[in-house]
Curated annotation (Swiss-Prot):
This is Glycoprotein. Keywords: Disulfide bond, Glycoprotein, Lipoprotein, Membrane, Palmitate, Signal, Transmembrane, Transmembrane helix, Viral envelope protein, Virion. The keyword Transmembrane helix applies. It is found in: Virion membrane. It is a single-pass type I membrane protein. It comes from Rabies virus (strain HEP-Flury) (RABV).
Amino acid sequence: MVPQVLLFAPLLVFPLCFGKFPIYTIPDKLGPWSPIDLHHLSCPNNLVVEDEGCTNLSGFSYMELKVGYISAIKVNGFTCTGVVTEAETYTNFVGYVTTTFKRKHFRPTPDACRAAYNWKMAGDPRYEESLHNPYPDYHWLRTVKTTKESLVIISPSVTDLDPYDKSLHSRVFPGGNCSGITVSSTYCSTNHDYTIWMPENLRLGTSCDIFTHSRGKRASKGDKTCGFVDERGLYKSLKGACKLKLCGVLGLRLMDGTWVAMQTSDETKWCPPGQLVNLHDFRSDEIEHLVEEELVKKREECLDALESIMTTKSVSFRRLSHLRKLVPGFGKAYTIFNKTLMEADAHYKSVQTWNEIIPSKGCLRVGERCHPHVNGVFFNGIILGSDGHVLIPEMQSSLLQQHMELLESSVIPLMHPLADPSTVFKDGDEVEDFVEVHLPDVHKQVSGVDLGLPKWGKYVLMIAGALIALMLIIFLMTCCRRVNRPESTQSNLGGTGRNVSVPSQSGKVISSWESYKSGGETRL
């Protein structure tokens, strides 16, 4: 039921046709950009493809294939062979009777075969009695023939039912197949001219036990049905579907290869010959569950990003990437141009390889051409790097770290405070903070020097400067006092002429610096 979709997508249905979930979705059609405010942002519902505006969901029941359905459905049946037993008796002169038995076939009738089968299954003794040889009749000196018709039932005889045309396949049929069973003709001819094959159940359709009833949500717009959310929570689009009968039941073959029987008012073409449906097994159901879980996880991440935007009242290119539609269909695209939040209607398509949307350096393909950027900004968090490469947040490459750094540094406030009821304005005619955010920093215009210190750092620097200045003043005052000492003091000190003895390393006593110097030079 899923080669590999969605749609999810896309999704599934989209290439949520399974086995290969799209690595990315990008608009193939992008409407004009219009400015919006922060509270206009919203997370897309990736579990429903907003296809052509069909967002009205209503509960309904539909029929799909059972898990374990296989292309060759086993149908139990039986063969019925008509046998005529002939007993020929001859009675001679003395009364001896000679009996000779002979058998031959006849073409049985379906009604008689059905009755014989019912006798056999019910253990009715009439079936066993019907197989006995006829009780011979005799007449003196005459030959008498007695015949008895019997129906030999052999069961089970298993055949394969083709669900597409309800034909039966078995080696017991001429050419290996039988397509003659209808309401009025409930048997098949076999390789034996006097043997017919019949299904155990008179209604062959009940042998085609491959359907199950499920509950889902129909996505519609007015009388038009665009798709539905199946029982596992995955959206399936009816775009491109065609009518196909399985076991005589009319249904729709979807683009992802699944089959459903549901009522729609739209005219749908018949599928071309040879159009088959995919196997519905536990693996396909598990893939659908995994895709749904991934889409739910991505929606939670989007809601977290949206909550962060509303809390901080700011948005970044990286956060905008969470708001991208993850499955093909109609949605929104967001971007930031010249510090203005912009929105555009978009129709998303799935991307399987990055080369599809980045064919060359600096080119982001949208539709059939390279999409222009505005100051290095595209949309949905896609930007142009400093080296000219297109940077996509979800792209796993060596540029991812560089991309993350660029995106994280691009956080700017976008929600106008006039739209925020929690904004508190200043008294008087003082400039409001939200205005200053959009103006150049006047401090940087006054001085090109910026120490980068916080407020407390500035105070520490001022205190340290004051202490250094105080120490310098004390040092200067001390020097001035020494200079202003009386000359008498200096003369008295000079006339004293005291000798200072300093012990040398050799143990001798040196009386003055001059003696120490001359002695040291002598030793050297």
